[in-house]
């Protein structure tokens, strides 16, 4: 089975112990940001992911679309469609016309893109860095560091809009030199969803091969 998109294991790599002393200014901004997103029934956004490794002279960009409702989501990116209803995950591989079915792992939390809005509450030290202006927008820059030093990720940098506490981007720094930047675009709050939004409908994928890994 093909590996999951890095956005999906983002929360997994940062599942850590309880947090210590924190920066109150950063904490206030993060709380406002978290409350904003948790108040939504659902949200949809397009995004761009950039993978950079300066030492290896690597820079790659891919774009995608995601729809999230609580712990449920539907992600389309780079020939893959990943659907999660909170219990089951379907990963559809377009080129192979194949869908892999697996159980969601509530402990790993790897299938919860919404974790970006709550992850700071446990296992991180966070610090207010500065305010910057990009494209005429004032952005508060906050850095989070995992307390578990064995973690592959050593830093996460969030950029939060001052005007409405929405997230513009986040950047993940890994020990192997890889840097992942996620830039949120075309954010839509509370899009319509129904019972079938977060399930895989085999009838819509003619001739699909089903691989049940449960």
Predicted region positions:
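Flexible, surface-exposed loop/linker segments and immediately adjacent secondary-structure boundaries
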Residues: 104-138
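An acidic-aromatic
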Residues: 63-111, 180-181
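Extracytoplasmic
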Residues: 40-42, 61-63, 70, 84, ...
């Amino acid at each position: 089975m093909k590996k999951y998109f890095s956005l999906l294991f983002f929360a997994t790599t940062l599942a850590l112990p309880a947090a210590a002393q924190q920066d109150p200014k950063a904490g206030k901004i993060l709380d406002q940001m978290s409350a904003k997103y948790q108040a939504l029934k659902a949200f949809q956004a397009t995004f761009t992911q950039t993978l950079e490794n300066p030492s290896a002279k690597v820079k790659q960009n891919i774009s995608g679309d995601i729809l999230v409702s609580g712990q449920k989501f539907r992600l389309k990116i780079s020939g893959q469609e990943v659907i999660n209803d909170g219990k089951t995950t379907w990963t559809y591989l377009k080129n192979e016309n194949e869908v892999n079915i697996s159980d969601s792992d509530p402990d790993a939390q790897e299938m919860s893109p919404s974790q970006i809005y709550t992850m700071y509450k446990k296992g991180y030290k966070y610090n207010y860095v500065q305010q910057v202006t990009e494209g005429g927008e004032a952005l508060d820059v906050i850095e989070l560091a995992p307390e578990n030093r064995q973690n592959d990720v050593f830093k996460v940098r969030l950029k939060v809009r001052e005007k409405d506490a929405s997230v513009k981007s986040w950047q993940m720094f890994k020990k192997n030199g890889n840097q992942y930047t996620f830039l949120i675009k075309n954010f839509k709050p509370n899009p319509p969803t129904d019972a079938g939004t977060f399930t895989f409908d085999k009838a819509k994928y003619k001739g699909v091969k089903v691989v049940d890994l449960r």
